[in-house]
Regions:
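PLP-dependent amino-acid enzyme catalytic core
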Residues: 1-221
């Protein structure tokens, strides 16, 4: 007898669904009908798309009885700040491996990381060059202290993390069914490619007609 797949662990963190907003004046200026998906409204310290990924990453972490989340990024990483905020909200320990030296003064996301109680490790260029190994070394030290760590790669770029934007794409499809335009293109910025991958999965599963276009930022198209 066929059995259904087990539910995918998920922690509801985002304020969703986020609205679709037509950019009236910009559309008139450019002669193209433009809409924006307001994922800047997902909540929890302006976490944007990161919180959607973390719903599934943290869900998997908790399913594995993790009490510590380990991730990495630049000194002003939005993703690291988001992980720190989620850990503060859920009572988990956050360990952030950040690229660069400890500054004399703290500002921006780095200041928020500290205020949120994250344990910050500053990585040398050599440590950053082998960041996967560095993260596993940190995890080993956490285990030696009796903790149960869960590693989140930079920007949450895993298959599990991509499920966040599968859910977002399903949300868009639902909004289209309830009166939003049938978009012919959905454009999204690309760093790791995870969010675009999630939208492509949603396109296949929901029948969205839009072409999913990723626009690389900071790194080249070949890397994405």
């Amino acid at each position: 007898m066929a059995t259904s797949a087990p539910p995918i662990p998920r922690v509801e963190l985002a304020y969703a669904p986020t609205p679709l907003l037509k950019l009236e004046r910009l559309s008139a200026e450019l002669g193209v009908e433009l809409w924006v998906k307001r994922d800047d409204l997902t909540g929890l310290l302006e976490t944007g798309n990161k919180i959607r990924k973390l719903e599934f990453l943290v869900g998997e972490a908790l399913a594995q009885s993790a009490d510590t989340l380990i991730t990495c990024g630049t000194l002003q990483s939005n993703c690291c700040r988001c992980v720190a905020a989620v850990c503060a909200r859920l009572g988990l320990r956050a360990v952030l491996a950040l690229k660069g030296a400890q500054p004399a003064e703290y500002d921006g996301n780095l200041l928020l990381d500290r205020l949120l109680g994250a344990d910050i490790r500053y990585c040398t260029d050599a440590e950053w060059a082998k960041i996967d190994e560095t993260l596993h070394d940190i995890a080993a030290r956490e285990r030696a202290q009796g903790r149960t760590p869960y590693i989140i790669p930079e920007s949450g770029a895993t298959v599990v993390g991509a499920l966040g934007y599968l859910a977002c794409g399903q949300e868009v499809a639902q909004q289209v069914r309830h009166g939003a335009p049938e978009f012919d293109t959905i454009a999204i910025t690309d760093f790791s490619g995870g969010s675009q991958a999630g939208l492509l999965m949603a396109k296949q599963l929901t029948g969205l007609r839009a072409e999913i276009v990723g626009v690389p930022i900071e790194i080249g198209r070949a890397h994405v």
